[in-house]
């Protein structure tokens, strides 16, 4: 999961790769298969013990490196539910260790500027992805952006805070487009 996320980050760095490589890296957005049924059941049980959704669609509408998004209904409201992948925190920590190892291994082969640039990307990436695997961080960010831009004309989803946790972000379902 972390390697796909790193590729997504690197896809924004024209100083590292040619346009051909950047296009290939960009194609990795949201291309992961969904969790297995067993993994989904474990994550769902951990996130929602005691919560009774009127309906919860097990087939995700999106599946990415950190989590997947499902449609659910609660008290008559259509919701988007982002569940983090099973065991993702441990996976991410192991991935960071591997990425750091390879960076140390290949560091002598890079120019001075590239060494420092790659090092900075890895450090920033490690911080970012460790925060991103916690859905409580996403909840906080959603609330922060909503409060900063209340009159921007941008429709932010409304979180159902009582249903959110480090495992799941539950919010109103908003139609939109991807850019």
Task: Report the location of each language-model feature.
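Broad phosphate/nucleotide-binding scaffolds in NTP-utilizing and phosphate-metabolizing enzymes
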Residues: 1-179
């Amino acid at each position: 999961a972390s390697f796909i996320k790193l590729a997504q980050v690197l896809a924004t760095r024209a100083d590292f790769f040619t346009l051909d490589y950047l296009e290939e890296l960009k194609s990795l957005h949201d291309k992961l298969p969904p969790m297995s049924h067993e993994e989904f059941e474990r994550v769902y049980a951990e996130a929602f013990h005691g919560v009774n959704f009127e309906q919860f669609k097990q087939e995700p509408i999106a599946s990415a490196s950190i989590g997947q998004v499902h449609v659910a209904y609660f008290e008559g409201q259509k919701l988007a539910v982002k569940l983090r992948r099973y065991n993702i925190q441990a996976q991410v920590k192991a991935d960071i260790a591997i990425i750091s190892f390879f960076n140390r291994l290949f560091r002598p082969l890079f120019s001075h500027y590239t060494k420092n640039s790659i090092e900075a990307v890895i450090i920033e990436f490690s911080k970012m992805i460790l925060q991103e695997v916690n859905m409580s961080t996403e909840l906080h960010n959603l609330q922060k952006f909503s409060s900063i831009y209340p009159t921007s004309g941008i429709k932010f989803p409304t979180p159902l805070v009582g249903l959110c946790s480090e495992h799941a972000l539950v919010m109103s379902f908003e139609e939109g487009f991807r850019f």
